[in-house]
Amino acid sequence: MKIVHCVFSFGIGGAETMLIDILNEQSKTETVSLVIVNHVYLDFLLEQINPAVRIFKLRRQKGSYSPFPVLKLNWLLYQLNPDVIHVHSSALLRIIALRAGRGLFLTVHDLHIPLEHAGRGTQLIAISEAVKADIQQRTGRMAMTIPNGIPMDKIEKRTRRASFVGKNMRIVQVSRLDVEKKGQDILIKAVALLKERGIENIEVDFIGEGRSEPRLRQLVQEYCVGNQINFLGLCDRQYIYSHLKEYDLMCHPARYEGFGLTVAEGIAAMLP
C-alpha cells in the first residue's frame, strides 16, 4: 500500500511527535511518503524518520497566495499515485484535488479545529475521546478515535523516592511556550504564591520555546522568582526521555488540550 502524509510544517509539537512514530512504523510494511508544504521544518526532527520514508519539501513561503505550490502539491500526488492520503491539517483539504478512488483521512489533533473543508468523503480521526466529542458537537459527524501513542521502552523510568529534605523539589513542564493554551503563567504565579508563604525550595524547568517566552520571562521578573524558574529552550525527544526521571513532578497547567501527549510521557517516566 502506498501512503502519503501531508502537513503544512514540521516543527515541535505533539502532532509531529506522533507522526514520526507513525511514519517509522508504517514504513516497515508499506510504501510511505511525507510531504511538507511550507518552508517550515526542523532538520533534527526529520533525521528521526526512517530513511525508507520519502520526504518531499515543497518550500512554500508561509502565507503565500502563489498558486504554484498548490499545483506542485497536486502534481506530486498524481505522480505518487497513493492508495491513502492522510492529512494533518484541515486547511490542506482545500487545496488537494486528487481524491477520487483514494482513502482520504484527516487526523484532528486538537479541540476546536475548523472542519469546513472536510467533506463527507473524508474520514475523520480523533486523537482522544474529548476531540471526538468536540467534532460531533460542532459538526454532527462521527470520528474514529485513535489515541496518541508513545514509545514506552524509550522513556527512562524514575526509581528514587521523593525526598525534599535539604534540596529543591524539581518540577518540569514540556510544551510550546504559549500561555493562551499551555498556561505556563499559571505555574509561575503558583510558584510566586508559595514563595509568599515561605515555601521556596521549588525549582521549575520549562522545556520548549514559543511566542510567549518574552512575556513569561517578564512575568518571572515581576514576581521575583528568577532563581526558581529556568527556561531550557528546545530539547530533542532523546534528551527529554532520558531526563524526565530526574524530576519530582510534572506539571501541565494547560487551559485546554486535545490529548496532552507530554502528560502520558511523564506518566511513562513514573512521574507524579
Where are each of the predicted segments found?
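Short alpha-helical donor nucleotide-sugar binding micro-motif in glycosyltransferases
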Residues: L77, L234-C235, S242-Y247
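Aromatic "clamp/platform" in nucleotide-sugar-dependent glycosyltransferases that forms part
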Residues: R255
